[in-house]
Amino acid sequence: MTISPPEREEKKARVIVDKDPVPTSFEKWAQPGHFDRTLARGPKTTTWIWNLHALAHDFDTHTSDLEDISRKIFAAHFGHLAVVTIWLSGMIFHGAKFSNYEAWLSDPLNVRPSAQVVWPIVGQDILNGDVGGGFHGIQITSGLFQVWRGWGITNSFQLYCTAIGGLVLAGLFLFAGWFHYHKRAPKLEWFQNVESMLNHHLQVLLGCGSLGWAGHLIHVSAPINKLLDAGVAVKDIPLPHEFILNKSVLIDLFPGFAAGLTPFFTLNWGQYADFLTFKGGLNPVTGGLWLTDISHHHLAIAVLFIIAGHQYRTNWGIGHSIKEILENHKGPFTGEGHKGLYENLTTSWHAQLATNLAFLGSLTIIIAHHMYAMPPYPYLATDYATQLCIFTHHIWIGGFLIVGGAAHAAIFMVRDYDPVVNQNNVLDRVIRHRDAIISHLNWVCIFLGFHSFGLYIHNDTMRALGRPQDMFSDTAIQLQPVFAQWVQNLHTLAPGGTAPNALEPVSYAFGGGVLAVGGKVAMMPIALGTADFLIHHIHAFTIHVTVLILLKGVLFARSSRLIPDKANLGFRFPCDGPGRGGTCQVSGWDHVFLGLFWMYNSLSIVIFHFSWKMQSDVWGTVDAAGNVSHITGGNFAQSAITINGWLRDFLWAQASQVINSYGSALSAYGLMFLGAHFVWAFSLMFLFSGRGYWQELIESIVWAHNKLKVAPAIQPRALSITQGRAVGVAHYLLGGIATTWAFFHAHILSVG
C-alpha cells in the first residue's frame, strides 16, 4: 500500500455527468433500425430482419465513441434489472394467487408445491395432478416454496406485498436507466474510475447487502422458522414487523437479544451465540442448513466485504491503486507481467465482461453442487424433483456463461486488443506461444478421450463375452478414486481441528451419518467407486475439449498461419473470401458455435451422472430400523461401468415414465418429450445443409409467386452461412435441453 500526495489524486472520485446529452424521442425509437444508417432505410431483402436482431444490442456498431457505448451499457443494466424484478414479481404473484403455499407450509412432507392450475378448455385439466392436501395443479420444481419458507413468509398476503414491491422496484430501475442516459449521463472517466467502483460494489452492494440480509435473517427469518419447526400453527405466528417492534417475542425465542447492543460494543460477542451459531450439518426437522448458521455466515461476509470496500485509493491518497498493483506484478518468467492489463480492462468492456462471465459461470456450477451437498432452504433436500431441477438449471446456466466468457474474450481480441499496449506482458506472451498451448491441450484431449472411452469399451466387451472377472469394477479389477476419497475423508475430519465446537461436519456428502426427514433421505455420505472414476474421466475429457475449442478461438481470433489478417475480417465471417478453399469455420464466432455443442455434450453427461448417482446411492426412504432403500437400489456401481448399462439402466429404464405418460397428469411431459425431439431434429436441417441449396429453392418459389402475381416487395434471401449455423445451434440446444427437462421431470415426479 502506498500513500500519495493528495494533489495527484484529487480528480479521482469527483462524479462528473453531462446534462441532457441525448433527447428522449419516441418517434426515433419507433423507427426500426434507427441505430444503424443502413438498417434505418428499411428492408430491401429478408436479410434486414436478421441484421436488425444481430446489431440491436451490439453497441460497438452503433458508434465508436467509448463514452456513449459505456452509457448505453450502463442504462441497459438498469433495464435488465427491471426485467428480472418484473419476472420475480410474476413468480411471487403466482405463489400468492394460484398456489397451495399455505397448505404446503402446514405439511411440507406430504403436500407437494404447485403454483399453476390449468383451465378446463379442451380437457387439458388432466394435467392438474393431485399434489396432496386436496389441491390439484401442476407440480413446480423451482424451489420457490422452500425459499419463501426460509425468508419467513407465512401467508399469501405477504407474497402479494412482495410481488407489488418487485414491480415498484422495476419502475425505479427503469427510471434510473432512462435518467442516467437521457438526463444525467456519467462521463467516461466515471466509468473508468475502478477504485471508486470497487469500493462501492464491495462495501455498499456486497457488504451492506449482506449486512441487511443478515439483519432480516436474524430478526425475521430465524424466529419464524424456529416457531414453524416447533410445530406452531401458522395463524399463531407473529407477523414479521411484530418481532422487530416487540422485543419480548424475540427474547422468548433467543435470550441473547435481552442483552441489547452492549455485548457488541464491549466485544463480548459470545452473548449472541444462540442466534449466531456454528452448529454445522443440517437441521434434522427440515433437512436444510441451520438458519442461525446462515445468519452468522452473512454477518461475517458483510464484515469482510465492508473492510474490503475500504482498500482502494480514491481522493484520500491512501489505499491501493489497481494500476500500480498490476504494473508491479512481475514474475521471473513473465516479462512485463501484468503491465497493460489495466488499460485493456478500462477501455474494453468486452475484456471486462469476458472475465466476469468466466468467473460467474464457474461460480454458478459451484453453487449447483452446494445446493445438494449443503441444502440452504428448509425441506429442499427431501424434494428430489426440485433438487434435480435446480442442479440441472445451475449447471446449464454456468455452461452458457462460460461459453459467453470465451465469446467476449474473442470479441475483445478482434475489436479492442492493442498490440502497442500489450508488449511482452502476460497476454502477449500467451498469444506468442499459443501453438505450444493448443497442441499440448489437443494431446491431452486425445489422451483423455481414448483412455476414458477405452475403459468403457473394455468393460462392454468383457460383459458381452461373459467375463465379469476381467472388468474394471468394484468387484473385479478396482479403479478406486483414491484422491477423491482422501479429500472426502479430509473434509470429514478437518472441522474437528478447525472448528472443534461445531456439532456436525460441514456436509454429510463427505462423511457422517444419514439424515432422514419424514422417512426420506435428506443427505448421506456419497461413496465413490470405480463407476465414478470412469465417468469422472469422461467429464475431464469433454471439459478439456470444450476448453480447447474456446481457447483456440480466443488465441487465434486475430491471426493464424492459415489467415494472417483474420482481425480485419471481424469476429464473425463464414470463410476467407471466394477463391480461398479450406478457410471456413475459422472465425471467433465459429469457435463459440462449436464450443456450444461441446458444452452441451459435456454438461449432459454431468447431469446424467448426478441424476443416476443420487437416485442410486443417496435418495430413498429410511425405515424405522434405519435401513435405507434407494430409488434405483444402488445399481449405479455395477451398471454405470458399461455404455450398454448407461443406455439400458439409465436412459431407457428411466424414460418409461415419460414414454408411458399419456392419459395421466404427466402427459404434457410426454408431448414435450416428442416436441423437443422434433425441435432438435429440425436443427439438423440447418446444420447439415448449404446456403446454395436453399437459395436455389427460394428462387424457384419466387418464380411461382411471380407467375401468380403475388411477388413479395421484400426480396427473399436464404440465410447466410452464419445465420444458418446460429439457427441450427439454437434449436439443437433448445431441443436437447427441453427433451432432458421432460425426461427428468416425468421420471423424478413419479418416483421422487
UniProtKB/Swiss-Prot annotation:
- What EC number is given for this enzyme? 1.97.1.12
Give the catalytic activity: reduced [plastocyanin] + hnu + oxidized [2Fe-2S]-[ferredoxin] = oxidized [plastocyanin] + reduced [2Fe-2S]-[ferredoxin]
* Its membrane topology: Multi-pass membrane protein
Give the record's PTM text. Answer: The N-terminus is blocked.
User: Where is chlorophyll a' bound in this sequence?
Assistant: 677
Q: Where does [4Fe-4S] cluster bind?
A: 575, 584
Co-factor: note: PSI electron transfer chain: 5 chlorophyll a, 1 chlorophyll a', 2 phylloquinones and 3 4Fe-4S clusters. PSI core antenna: 90 chlorophyll a, 22 carotenoids, 3 phospholipids and 1 galactolipid. P700 is a chlorophyll a/chlorophyll a' dimer, A0 is one or more chlorophyll a, A1 is one or both phylloquinones and FX is a shared 4Fe-4S iron-sulfur center.
Q: Which SUPFAM superfamilies match?
A: Photosystem I subunits PsaA/PsaB (SSF81558)
| Residue spans crossing the bilayer | 73-96, 159-182, 198-222, 294-312, 349-372, 388-414, 436-458, 533-551, 591-612, 666-688, 726-746
Q: Name one GO biological process term.
A: photosynthesis
On the tree of life, the source organism's domain of life is Bacteria
- The residues that the entry says bind chlorophyll a are 685, 693
Q: Name one Pfam family in it.
A: PsaA_PsaB
What are this entry's molecular-function GO terms? Answer: 4 iron, 4 sulfur cluster binding; chlorophyll binding; electron transfer activity; magnesium ion binding; oxidoreductase activity
Q: Where does phylloquinone bind?
A: 694
Provide this UniProt record's keywords sorted from A to Z.
4Fe-4S, Chlorophyll, Chromophore, Electron transport, Iron, Iron-sulfur, Magnesium, Membrane, Metal-binding, Oxidoreductase, Photosynthesis, Photosystem I, Thylakoid, Transmembrane, Transmembrane helix, Transport
Q: Where in the cell is it found?
A: Cellular thylakoid membrane
Which PROSITE patterns does this chain map to?
A: PHOTOSYSTEM_I_PSAAB
* GO CC annotation terms, alphabetical: photosystem I; plasma membrane-derived thylakoid membrane
Q: Which InterPro entries does the entry mention?
A: PSI_PsaA, PSI_PsaA/B, PSI_PsaA/B_CS, PSI_PsaA/B_sf
PANTHER family documented for this protein: OUTER MEMBRANE PROTEIN, OMPA-RELATED (PTHR30128), PHOTOSYSTEM I P700 CHLOROPHYLL A APOPROTEIN A1-RELATED (PTHR30128:SF19)
| Oligomer status and interactors | The PsaA/B heterodimer binds the P700 chlorophyll special pair and subsequent electron acceptors. PSI consists of a core antenna complex that captures photons, and an electron transfer chain that converts photonic excitation into a charge separation. The cyanobacterial PSI reaction center is composed of one copy each of PsaA,B,C,D,E,F,I,J,K,L,M and X, and forms trimeric complexes.
Protein function = PsaA and PsaB bind P700, the primary electron donor of photosystem I (PSI), as well as the electron acceptors A0, A1 and FX. PSI is a plastocyanin/cytochrome c6-ferredoxin oxidoreductase, converting photonic excitation into a charge separation, which transfers an electron from the donor P700 chlorophyll pair to the spectroscopically characterized acceptors A0, A1, FX, FA and FB in turn. Oxidized P700 is reduced on the lumenal side of the thylakoid membrane by plastocyanin or cytochrome c6.
HAMAP family referenced in this protein's UniProt entry, alphabetically: PSI_PsaA
Give the protein's recorded name: Photosystem I P700 chlorophyll a apoprotein A1
Q: Which gene encodes it?
A: psaA
